[in-house]
Amino acid sequence: MRAKVLQCLGRVQAEGLIDKRMGNLSGGELQRVLLALALEPLPNVLILDEPLSGVDVEGMTALMDMLDEVRVNYDLSILMTTHNFDMLKRYANQVVLINHTVLCDGTAEDVLSGKEFAQVFHRTGEAI
């Protein structure tokens, strides 16, 4: 059993957390452990709801880099919700803006600079 857990944690570079109690994990560490659970068994599509919530800035970058690596290594599609526009610009290859219904979709740059985004968030692309 321990070998299987280490294998799962290894997918998200978190083997060193195997003996840590869940309550003692940082936000980023907890997200890695939860992601390891979500990847067993390996899905075709990984759906994440605000995975950056509660994670510090350094942890966000590390988590997104790791998600990108997992996506490539395991040929996964990742669908995630986020309000972190900086991470969207850096990592997303397709963005869908939803406010009760699909308002627009495209590249992060296109969506974040679009009129629909400005209407929903009362912001413009230049301010992001």
Model-found features: residue ranges?
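Conserved catalytic motifs of ABC-family nucleotide-binding domains
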Residues: L42
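H-loop (His-switch) and adjacent beta-strand-loop-beta switch element
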Residues: V95-T107
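Conserved ABC ATPase "signature" region
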Residues: M1-L17
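A short, surface-exposed alpha-helical micro-motif characterized by mixed small hydrophobic
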Residues: L88-R90
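Conserved ABC ATPase signature
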Residues: R21-L25, E29
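Catalytic Walker B motif of ABC-type/P-loop ATPase nucleotide-binding domains
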Residues: L46-E50
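H-loop/switch region of ABC-family ATPase nucleotide-binding domains
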Residues: T82-H83
